[in-house]
Swiss-Prot record:
PROSITE patterns: ANK_REP_REGION, ANK_REPEAT. Expressed ubiquitously. The lineage of its organism: Eukaryota, Metazoa, Chordata, Craniata, Vertebrata. This is Cyclin-dependent kinase 4 inhibitor B. The gene is Cdkn2b. It comes from Mus musculus (Mouse). Keywords: ANK repeat, Cell cycle, Phosphoprotein, Repeat, Tumor suppressor.
Length: 130
């Protein structure tokens, strides 16, 4: 773990969806679970539409089940709400739980349905056996 600016740079690169920068920082030893100044990890602030960023972070040890300290949302909640099936699948295959509620009692499937993301809702129902 390098700490400091490398870890902060990783969160920024993940948020911007900068795949090559994320790869370089991780290969240089940046901590995929380092908290930013808001108490969030790179996998929580990553550009949800970038399944490649998710894969890189997870490959280097990012925790797929980390919860937001205020809302209890996890990356799967964000991917389901925003409509990013590819990212959701990557997270799920890496061990992300689909059966955990956020602070308002909503599951990822609830968020997908609220937003009209039928393909994601179908995937989540199939994955959870509902």
């Amino acid at each position: 773990m390098l700490g400091g600016s490398s870890d902060a740079g990783l969160a920024t690169a993940a948020a911007r969806g900068q795949v090559e920068t994320v790869r370089q920082l991780l290969e240089a030893g940046a901590d995929p679970n380092a908290l930013n100044r808001f108490g969030r990890r790179p996998i929580q602030v990553m550009m949800m539409g970038s399944a490649q960023v998710a894969e890189l972070l997870l490959l280097h040890g990012a925790e797929p089940n980390c919860a937001d300290p205020a809302t209890l949302t996890r990356p799967v909640h964000d991917a389901a709400r925003e409509g990013f099936l590819d990212t959701l699948v990557v997270l799920h295959r890496a061990g992300a739980r689909l059966d955990v509620c956020d602070a308002w009692g909503r599951l990822p499937v609830d968020l997908a349905e609220e937003q009209g993301h039928r393909d994601i809702a179908r995937y989540l129902h199939a994955a959870t056996g509902d």
